[in-house]
Amino acid sequence: MTAPNGTTPAAARRDTSPPYLERGSRSYWRASVALLFAGYATFSLLYYVQPLLPEFSTTFGVSPAQSSLALSFSTGALAIAVFVAGFVSEGLSRHRLMTASLMLSSVLTLVAAFAPHWHQMLVLRALTGLALGGVPAVGMAYLAEEVHPDGLGLAMGLYVGGNAIGGMAGRVIAGVLADLFTWRIAIAAIGVLGLAATLAFRALLPPSRHFTPRRGLGFAQHRAALARHLAGRRELPVLFAMAFILMGGFVTLYNYVGYRLLAPPYSMNQATIGAIFVVYLVGVVASPWSGRMADSLGRGRVLIASVVIMLAGVALTLLQPVAAIACGIACVTFGFFAGHSTASGWVGRLATQGKGQAAALYLLSYYLGSSIVGSLGGRFWSASGWAGVAALVATLLTAGLAAAAWLRRRERSGAA
C-alpha cells in the first residue's frame, strides 16, 4: 500500500514529522543561546563560592575542608537532583522545568547572602543544588532531541561554553565584589544576575518539537531504562566514569588554589585572585572547538587530548611563578571543558532511548566527582599543601587517560 504521492506510509509519516533544528537556522541559534544562558546561570550560581571559601573560613571559623562543604553540599544535592530530574522530566514540560529550577535557585542565592550562621549557609547551598537539578540533564536531553545530529556537537559545545562563562563570571564577580565590599554583597549580585539570565532563557528557548511527555511511568520502567544504559552499551558506564574523573579533578584544583594564592609568598587579595580566574574563559573556546573536532576527527581522539592537556596543566601549577600557575589553571580549564563537551555529546549519541535518563546518569557521576573529590582535596591540602592536591588530581586523571584510550579503541572498531 502506498500513499497518494507514491511513497510508503512510513515515508509519509517521516515527511510530516516536525523538523529538527538545523545548524544555521534562526531556531537553532535561539535554542543554542537560550541554553548558553542556562549554562551561565547554573555554573555561576553553583561555583561563585570557590573564591569565597577563605572568607567563609575567616567569618565562620571553619577549616578549609569544612569551608569546601559550601560547594560540596550543592554539588552533592545537585547529583541527586539531576538523577531524579532525568526521570521526572520525561513526564513534564522541559521548558517549564528548567525555568522553574533557574528561578528558584536564583532566589535561594539571594537568601544565602543574609545567612547568619554556617549551618544555615550549608542548608541554603544544598537547597540551591537541589533546585538546579532541573537544568543540566534536561538541557542536554533537549538538545539531543531537538537539534539535528549534524549540528549537535556545536550546540552542545555552546551550552557547555555557557557553563564556562558562568563559572568565570561567578568566580570573578564574587571575588572582586567581596574585595571591594563584602562577600554578602557579592552573593546578592550573583543572585540578581541569575534572575536576569533566567528571564533571557525563558524568552529565547523554542518549544519542544520531538518530545512527548510520558506520564505515569513507574519505577519498573525507570529501572529498565537504567539497566539499558548501564548494561546495554559498554561505553556508557565508562563515559559516566569519565564525568566523575574530569569534574572531580577540575573542581578540586579550583577549590584550593585560592588558599595557595592568599598565603605567602603570594599574599594576593580576593580581587587579584578573581582576575586570575578570567582564564576560565578558555572554556568558552574549548567547548565549541571540541565539538567541531569531535565531529571531524572522532570523539576518542579529542577525549584523550583533553585529559593530556589537563595533566600538563596540573604539572605547571607545581611551579612557583604566578604566570606558570595561571597557565596551568588555563590548561586544566581548557582540557576539562573540551573533555566534558565531548563526553556529554557522546552520551547523547549512544543513548538511542531515554536520553533524559542517560543524561541524568552522566551528571550524577559528574557532580558526585565534584562533591566527593572536592572535599577529599581539603585533606590533601591540610596534609601536604599544594603538592598533595596536585598528586590527587594527577592520579585521578591518569585513570581517566586509560579510560579515554579504551573508548578510542571502541570507536575505531565501530562499536561506539
Regions found by a protein language model. Name each.
Residues Q120, P149, L158-L205:
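Helix-loop-helix hairpin linking two adjacent transmembrane segments in secondary transporters
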Residues L108, H119-T128, A323-C331:
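Paired small-residue
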Residues I80-H119:
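Conserved MFS/SLC helix-loop-helix module at the cytosolic interface between two early adjacent transmembrane helices
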Residues D15-S25, P206-F240:
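Juxtamembrane intracellular "pre-TM" segments in multi-pass secondary transporters
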Residues R96-L110, R301-A315, A394:
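Structural signature of the two symmetry-related core transmembrane helices
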Residues L124-I165:
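Cytoplasmic helix-loop-helix junction between adjacent transmembrane helices
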Residues G300-A343:
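C-terminal transmembrane helical hairpin of 12-TM major facilitator-type secondary transporters
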Residues V82-S93, V285-G298, W381:
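Helix-to-loop junctions at the C-terminal end of transmembrane segments
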